[in-house]
Amino acid sequence: MSAQEASKPTGWSGHQNFTMDDLAAMQPGLARIMPEIGTRYWKLYYAAKENNWTLAHFQLKEIKELMEFGMVTRPKYEEHLDTFIKDDLGAIEKAIKAQDWNAVDAAFQQGITNANDYHQLNNKGFIVWKLPDYPPPDIDLTPQD
């Protein structure tokens, strides 16, 4: 190990020391984040359809946070992610706050179109997200409040 490497701050994981460069390299890109976003987008849709506005809003908030994280770890996508958050998720949020299922559905469908357009713009046109035609089986969508 060089003197320069030895002087870099490290942190112990319980298994080994990691430098800041090691930690930076481990940060997930959109290939790891987007599947979670897709799952939450799916849950948001069916939660709203069942009038579980609290769960729908929670999923929306989590999607925003994941996209914001993606803007940090993959800044080349920042502009498109930011636009999607402001425009598409903004329209969905407005509809959720109004508890307007028809507006949620319309904004959600537009979001799918726009997301797939972003995939095309970023040379990832082979990724075409679609809404499953059934609700997620791993969560009770019944309103709890």
Model feature map: region roles:
Residues 2-145:
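C-terminal-biased regions
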